[in-house]
């Protein structure tokens, strides 16, 4: 059975590096992991923009992209990715949800 990482990449608007965030892990099929990620994308409330006017969600090859337009004219991009775990140096344990 495969283990899938549901990741969020939220690069800073000014090009500063921000680490990816592990939203959840799913053991099972790619389809079940995609369904879980799809639901997380729909429920995700980004911290920016503070006053969102419009949110668009696009399907990509490995997940989804969310573009949020703010009231002041800025746009913020969020990339949600589905990644299959290939190797883990830690103990084999139960998947843990880190996104609430």
Question: Which ranges hold each PLM region?
Answer:
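Short, mixed-charge low-complexity intrinsically disordered segments
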Residues: 43-100
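Hydrophobic/aromatic beta-strand elements that line small-molecule binding cavities or substrate pockets
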Residues: 24-25, 55
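Short aromatic-glycine-(Arg/Gly/Cys) micro-motifs in beta-strand/loop hairpins
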Residues: 1-22
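A short, charged, amphipathic alpha-helix used as a generic interaction element across diverse proteins
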Residues: 27-51
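Short beta-strand-to-loop capping motifs
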Residues: 25-28, 68-70
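Generic "edge-of-domain/loop-turn" microfeature
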Residues: 13-15, 31, 73, 87
């Amino acid at each position: 059975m495969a283990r899938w990482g549901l990741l969020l990449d939220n690069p800073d608007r000014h090009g500063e590096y921000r680490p990816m965030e592990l939203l959840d892990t799913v053991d099972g099929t790619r389809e079940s992991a995609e369904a879980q990620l799809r639901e997380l994308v729909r429920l995700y409330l980004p911290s920016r923009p503070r006053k969102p006017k419009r949110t668009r969600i696009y399907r990509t090859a490995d997940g989804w992209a969310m573009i949020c337009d703010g009231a002041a004219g800025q746009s913020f991009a969020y990339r949600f990715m589905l990644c299959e775990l290939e190797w883990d140096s830690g103990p084999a344990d139960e998947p843990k949800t880190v996104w609430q």
